[in-house]
Amino acid sequence: MDKSDLVQKAKLAEQAERYDDMAASMKAVTEGGVELSNEERNLLSVAYKNVVGARRSSWRVISSIEQKTEGNEKKQQMAREYREKIEAELQEICNDVLGLLEKYLIPNASQAESKVFYLKMKGDYYRYLSEVASGDSKRTTVENSQKAYQDAFEISKKEMQPTHPIRLGLALNFSVFYYEILNTPEQACSLAKTAFDEAIAELDTLNEDSYKDSTLIMQLLRDNLTLWTSENQGDEGDAGEGEN
């Protein structure tokens, strides 16, 4: 199937909310080895975000049930085995994406914007792996995630406006990484606040095309800041961090 057919198939799959099919089509496009257009890049990102998001959500539900069944060995074992099955699926998806990033997407990225987009994606998928990892594997995935985010962050500060939705989305997810994975709320809040304040200061540079995306991410940054600040003051809040 040629590239334009695969892209069309991915769009059909998105309309039908069949994200596994959408991801398979966009994986095939990526493996063609040609740099993706912005539209193709977004299709790939949306597909895998939904595919992995479903497993992350399932994993959280089953992990919670597993903890609640302490004392009932049979139920707990069933929950554990099911969690491990979901975990294996999640790991396979993340490794798929990371493979595409390493082999095709990052090496082929000619623009700073694409490089930041893909390095952020690398940070995200190592973060998802770290959520279900333990021991040495946890340490490695956390380090890889932080390095990818940091590399993306350096480029975004040099090459992109503070109001650019990709730069803002990176700040959002990197701050969630600090809060949830490294458990460093001060760093999380500082990063999110700086990104928000810098964007506010340059609101006049907001590109009309990306106005909606940028303001939505700014809202998520502010929501997270509010939540994290209240949690650190001892209020019990539900940690429903917004992510991009």
Swiss-Prot record:
Keyword Acetylation attached: yes
InterPro entries: 14-3-3, 14-3-3_CS, 14-3-3_dom_sf, 14-3-3_domain
Site (Interaction with phosphoserine on interacting protein): R56, R127
UniProt GO cellular component terms: cytoplasm
Principal subcellular localization: cytoplasm
One BP annotation, GO: signal transduction
Subcellular location as annotated: Cytoplasm
Keywords, alphabetical: Acetylation, Cytoplasm
The organism's place on the tree of life at top rank: Eukaryota
SUBUNIT field: Homodimer, and heterodimer with other family members.
Chain's role: Adapter protein implicated in the regulation of a large spectrum of both general and specialized signaling pathways. Binds to a large number of partners, usually by recognition of a phosphoserine or phosphothreonine motif. Binding generally results in the modulation of the activity of the binding partner.
Protein name: 14-3-3 protein beta/alpha-A
Species, as recorded: Danio rerio (Zebrafish)
